[in-house]
Every structure is written in C-alpha cells, then in structure tokens.
Amino acid sequence: MCGIVGYTGQQQAAPVLLEGLKKLEYRGYDSAGIAVMQQKKIAISKVTGRIAGLAQKTDDGKLLPGTTGIGHTRWATHGAPTDTNAHPHASNDGRFAVVHNGIIENYLELRQELIGKGYHFESETDTEVIVHLLEMYYKGDLKQAVMRTSARLKGSYALGILCTDQPEKIFAVREASPLILGVGVGEVYFASDVTALVAYTRNAIYLEDGEFAELTPEFIQIYDCMGRPVQKKVTRITWDVQAAEKGGYEHFMLKEIMEQPSAVKATLTPRIKGNEIVLDDADIDLTGIRKIVITACGSAYYAGCAAKFAIEELCRIPVLVELASELRYSNPLIDSSTLLIVLSQSGETADTIAAMKECQSRGAKALAIVNVVGSTISKLADWCIYTWAGPEIAVATTKGYTTQLTVLYLFALYAAKKLQTIDSSLYGILMSALKAIPRKMQESLDMNPGIGKLAKKYHKASSMFFIGRNTDYAVALEGALKMKEISYIHAESYAAGELKHGTIALIHEGQPVVALCCNDAITEKTMSNIVEVKARGAEVLAVAGKENQRILSLADDMIYVPKIHPLFSAAVEIVPLQMLAYHVAKENGCDIDKPKNLAKSVTVE
C-alpha cells in the first residue's frame, strides 16, 4: 500500500508521476518512489518520507528523463519505512521494475522458494517476490511472464510492471485492489484511483479483478486471467479532484465507514489459513500468563472494552481494560504473569507509549495492535499485529476501531486454542462467525437506508444517552463518543442497569435514548430499562435485530442489525451508530472530517 501510478506517452514521465503521487497523498504514506525507462535500463529513485523529498531528489523529475514510468506511495505493511523497502523494486538482472499496492499473503513461501533458486532479496517487503518471479518466468514473452507470475500470487495486488526489453510498454494487473486506466491522445495513464488521472484525462477504463492490461502510447489491450482479450468501455469521469480523493463520497468519514467491510476482510483474510489462525510472525507465548491488561486511549480503549468479553469467555483469563492516561500513574499490579495488549491506530499515542513502558518495566510482555508499520509502539512491543486498515483520513476513527476489534477477536480465538480452553465445536462456530463479520457489516449498512431521516429528527437534541448491557454497553461507549466528537451534541453512555442509580433523574420529555439490544441473553433486562425511560417521556431509538418484535413495539424508532454471535456483535452494531453520528453532524453543518479541537494522532500528554 498505498497508491500506484503509471504513464507512457510523449511527455517526460517523471513530472507526471510526481504530480500523480501528490494527488494520492490524502491516502497516507511513509515513503515514495518512481522508475523511468531510459533506453535499455530502468532508473529508480525513492525516498523515505514525503513526496516533496522525492521531487527535490530528482529535481522535480528532470534528473530522470524518459517517457515511460511507474510510481508508488507506500504505507508499510511488510518491513519498516526505509528507502530499501520503498517501491519500485527491481529484479536481480535489472530487466524488471514493479510497483505494487496490496498484500501478498503467500510471500514467505515464495520468498523461500526464490532464495533457494538463487535470487537475492534487497528488501523485507512482500512485493519483491513479484519482480523475482517475473525474472524467473521471463523467456522472451512478457505477457506469459506476467500471467505465470500472477497465477502464483495469493492476496490483493494492483501492479505496474516495466521491462527493458519493451521500453514503451507497461503491464498493469489488478486483483482485489483498485486500478484504473486513463486514456489520452498518444498517451496512457494508470492509477489506484481517479484522483491521479483527472488533471490529465477524463476518459477512464476500470479494470476488474483478474484482468491485466498491456499499455503503449497508442495501444491498450486488456486480458482476462487466461490471457484472452477483453473489451472494456471507456467511462467519462465527471468528479472534480477533491471529490475524486473521497471516492465520490461527500466526506472522508463516510468513505471510511463504507470501506469497513473490505477493511475488516483485509485484516482477517491473511490471518486465517483454512481453519487455523496465524497472527503474522507473532508466536505469542502465553505460558504462565494469569492476567491480561488492555490499555489504550479513546476509541481504541472502547475496542478493548468490547473485546474483553470475548477474551475472558474464551480464554478463561481475567482481562482488565485500562485507560493509558490513568494506567501510567496508578502503580499497577503488573508483573511477568501479565500480558499487556496495547492498542493504537498511529502507534505514536503519547499516553499509551508511557503506560506501555511502565508496564514493561514491571515485567509484562507486550502485544501491540497498531496500523502504522515501524511506529514507536510496534518497535517497543514483544509482539506486534498490524490491523492493515490502510490510511484513515477523518479524525474520528471508524475502520481503525473495527479493525482493532477484529484483531482482538482473532487473538481471542488464537489464544483459546493455544490454551486449550475451547472445544472444537465452539471453535468451528466462532470461526464461521468471525469470517462472516465483513458480510454482516455490509448487511448492517444495507439494512438502514433511513438513518438520514432519523438524523433529521434527532439532530436538534441538546443531549443523548446511549444504553446497553455487556457487549452492548461497550458499543454504547463508542457510539456516544462518535456522536459527541463530530456532531458536538452532548452524548453519554451508561450501563443500562445503572440508570436507576442516578441517571434516570435526567430523563425528561423528548430526551433521546439510544438503546442497544443485540444480545438475546440479556435483551429482556434492557427492555425493562426501555420501559422505564419511556414512562418518563424519553424518545427511544433501539438498535436490534428485525426478529425482535417486542422491541419493535416498544421503541419510537429502530436501527436494524443482522444477527451474529454475541461475542463478535460489537463490530457489526457500531456501524449504523457511526452512520447516525455522521448524518446528525451533517444536519448540524459540522466539519465532519476535522472536528474542532481534535487531532488524528495525539502525540502529547
């Protein structure tokens, strides 16, 4: 990850590539590079850091003359952000250069195979196996080499390929990662999204999974995975540049909400091999562990609260969830029998780093769950699992939260099997439920087209209460946070059973109460709380399954969620609450992507 561009035509390629990469900056990245064809060689330049540094290094592209080239911005997934790990990558013989957006799931076995055949690896990336496979399979027929290489890859990839034997040609390949061709006059472009294209052309061809394209300045031929020609229509791009960056969505937050099914799938898929869970290179030693402490801030903390139930239920180990800003000052009862789980999207959250260091100084082993490769927390940890959520631009997290939660679910099942605290029958049921989360998330989006209308009803509220029990309460915490941080409406969450211990005094005529009722085992109890607040004039917006007819009859309004195992329900329940907060904020004219007084990464105490 995170974006690729390519050009072949009459212009100098490097300035076009640099400009295209700048248009992809919004996606987030930690390094960048370009490769330009120069007669019988490929010139490559890459840097760690900003595209401005790459432009400076190449004198805005002037130092890399040539009319055919490829470019890349990287968000590290395999290997730290370094010049060596940055793309493009070159083959040992210098004949090929490749840029890649995605994740190659079987790269370790391919890497070992290629090393055994004498190929030398310069980087730690999964991408480098691609360029060596191309070299291995190339026998003078570039199309065949591309097809044979693609057939060996498992995972997601959008590729741009240069070969010195055909200096005006680029091959572009798509599998589960977006790739769009831009059609000009005597020139052709490609990019991960239209943002990088609209300054040059409005004519686009969208590749589908399993397709690849052979590109020259005057010629575009698209093939299916068997090498058979495919006819594709040219689509006229009507978006402006800003809209293109947002994928046609009005806000980044909405885009990221809608991306969650695919983001969670990207988190899950590489970690599930058949019916086994493989947590990257994190062979977590649970010997002697008698307590698990989860520490984080903000939404990451609430992800820990939601996952606590699954970990305790399956692993039979007590789990404490602690705010990092409190844990660091609390003289915690932590020692070598404690596993510390540290959650942070950025991996740079100041309070979380400080709490982590304090616990490690007392003997705890630390498992980090972060999104940014090479971040401080990932380096401090004994083990690290990356969420692979991709860049999240909106300040209010959505897919960052759900991918953290997904990794915690993976850990719960992984640890339970390792500790032998789960029988094979339940393990099978929960594995099926885990794999179903992306589909259920999409269903939760599809089931609630009327959330915008609900927002029109509730957006003038001065305060909102969110209630639930067990995992529903954990979701209520995050739902209330989403509402307050982007709509600026005072929103608080309460354990439903605690209402009568004080909070019910605040209920008045017309007071909005969002009641989560997604756990059948405790739905009756939550329903009694709904009756209590309704008796005092509250307007109840219930979150429940369509099959729960009694709640339908009690609530003033409904948000529906599909049925899923209650241990994993939080990842599905939260999605419509994110949408509710989004639409309420939109009704109130708030700056949704950049709420006032908030920052994406809190790197100070």
What spans do the regions from the language model cover?
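Active-site phosphate/pyrophosphate-binding segments
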Residues: Q260-V264, L268-V293, W383-P512, A585-E605
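Glycine-rich oxoanion-binding loops at beta->alpha junctions
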Residues: T67, G71-T84, P270-D283, A307-L343, ...
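Glycine-rich phosphate-binding loops that contact phosphosugars or nucleotide phosphates
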Residues: T287-G428, S432-A436, L516-I559, L580, ...
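Acidic/histidine-rich
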Residues: S156-E187, L454, H459-E485, D520-I522, ...
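Generic C-terminus detector
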Residues: E539, L552-L554, I564-E605
